Amino acid sequence: MATEQRPFHLVVFGASGFTGQFVTEEVAREQVDPERSSRLPWAVAGRSREKLQRVLEKAALKLGRPTLSSEVGIIICDIANPASLDEMAKQATVVLNCVGPYRFYGEPVIKACIENGASCIDISGEPQFLELMQLKYHEKAADKGVYIIGSSGFDSIPADLGVIYTRNKMNGTLTAVESFLTIHSGPEGLSIHDGTWKSAIYGFGDQSNLRKLRNVSNLKPVPLIGPKLKRRWPISYCRELKGYSIPFMGSDVSVVRRTQRYLYENLEESPVQYAAYVTVGGITSVIKLMFAGLFFLFFVRFGIGRQLLIKFPWFFSFGYFSKQGPTQKQIDAASFTLTFFGQGYSQGTGTDKNKPNIKICTQVKGPEAGYVATPIAMVQAAMTLLSDASHLPKAGGVFTPGAAFSKTKLIDRLNKHGIEFSVISSSEV
């Protein structure tokens, strides 16, 4: 409930940023959802009132909502001003943090939210940030009874919830899953805003600290159920999808593994092994990506190399990333398919000595990943946090999407909003 002390259910922080403007549009759509009994009280937050006002005016024009600007609160807030972050958090039930790269700008928002009793959702795809925040703030968030949920965009809700969906649909014990991401584009091709590119550069350039963080965490290994899932070669051919694939370098594997650990340790659910890949089509695409990958991995090791990668994203990514981001036509024509191939054991079959005897294939399909599916996932995660509290983990804390939402109706919400989960096949072998 909105109150005088906390007047907004949702606050979109960074609403005037490239991704934030799309999240703002999605919240505006949710505000007038016919299934809602009342209007959603919400606000946008950022450094410039003029920029925030322009974002609201643009959304109003696009959605045919001329009165939108007068219906939405505006909060002036600067990541460099902790007092302004406190004031924002005091007014929100849930903060949707769209300000990245999160390794530089994410922690002050989380700290302000915890100290002032607001929950926070972000769309980070940065494993080091996500794992560090869980290590530093899980107990503090639990003490305050608030939920800090990272990676709630395309990274990594489709993968994390997709594995849970696959497990729920298997008539037996799921032990291992491989996922294959396929990105579909229209005649004008693909383009991704360079904010994502920067996050990848900083993440790959700091792999040693991620390893140190995991050593400090000193977590016990999760038990291995069934045969160990074999890693594919850096370039492999997927017969089922009739195309080549490479390992997916996003946060999905890190997030899914953390979820599986939580479900095993807290809910006594059998852990699932997981590997993630992205399909790249034919041999020409493979060669192109090999060169791009070699360039990236060479330059990202050095400070001056990282500066060059950041300054010339279009050149070093072979045209996939740009400072301008995608056009509306590119966004409208794009979509994704995430295909899961799972294996496990039918009910009553022992997992110790027997080979897996059941297979399942599921899919998650949706619109353009970065600026349509991500806002949908983020906003529906927030709405689930607001409306399905009885099925969340009992105490607050820092969670992955799967850990927070495995018992909620988030998958149903996503299905209704264009991110569709389905079973393709299931069979005993």
UniProtKB/Swiss-Prot annotation:
EC annotation from Swiss-Prot or TrEMBL: 1.-.-.-
The keyword Calcium is annotated on this UniProt entry: no
An annotated GO BP: glycolipid biosynthetic process
One of the record's GO molecular function terms: oxidoreductase activity
Modified residues (N-acetylalanine): A2
Membrane-spanning ranges: none
Phosphoserine found at: S217
Family membership noted in the UniProt record: Belongs to the saccharopine dehydrogenase family.
Designated name of the protein: Saccharopine dehydrogenase-like oxidoreductase
